[in-house]
Amino acid sequence: MDPNTVSSFQDILLRMSKMQLESSSGDLNGMITQFESLKLYRDSLGEAVMRMGDLHSLQNRNEKWREQLGQKFEEIRWLIEEVRHKLKITENSFEQITFMQALHLLLEVEQEIRTFSFQLI
């Protein structure tokens, strides 16, 4: 795992949590939950790739991993759209910076998951 990506996840989640406390927006809750879920999925895929011996057990244990992978890409696309929308409508510089970092992180993680998944195929 890239330590920068892990710290980026933690930073984004912390920033979004602060934003959530300052606003009554319920949709930030969903975004935070999705980010946490995405982080866990990315980490588990990365671990499976690092232990290539687990590749076959991963595939045998969970025949639906390709379907799950597709769902994660859908979640990433949804998050990217949500973050872009938030970025367009916000005027607060703290929020703009947070959403710009979140967008960059999502694009980076999408690429990492693609790389992991190609290694698992």
Curated annotation (Swiss-Prot):
GO CC annotation terms, alphabetical: extracellular region; host cell nucleus; virion component
Gene3D superfamilies cross-referenced by the UniProt entry: 1.10.287.230
Keywords: Host nucleus, Host-virus interaction, Transport, Virion
Ranges annotated as spanning the membrane: none
GO biological process entries: exit of virus from host cell nucleus through nuclear pore
Pfam families, per database record: Flu_NS2 (PF00601)
Record keyword Transport present: yes
Main location: virion
Superkingdom of the source species: Viruses
Localization, UniProt: Virion; Host nucleus
SUPFAM superfamilies, per database record: Nonstructural protein ns2, Nep, M1-binding domain (SSF101156)
Motif Nuclear export signal, residue range(s) on this chain: 12-21, 85-94
Summary of subunit composition and partner proteins: Interacts with protein M1. May interact with host nucleoporin RAB/HRB and exportin XPO1/CRM1.
Its biological purpose: Mediates the nuclear export of encapsidated genomic RNAs (ribonucleoproteins, RNPs). Acts as an adapter between viral RNPs complexes and the nuclear export machinery of the cell. Possesses no intrinsic RNA-binding activity, but includes a C-terminal M1-binding domain. This domain is believed to allow recognition of RNPs bound to the protein M1.
Extra facts: Average number present in a viral particle is estimated to be 130-200 molecules.
Family assignment from sequence similarity: Belongs to the influenza viruses NEP family.
Protein name: Nuclear export protein
Organism: Influenza A virus (strain A/Puerto Rico/8/1934 H1N1)
Gene that encodes the chain: NS
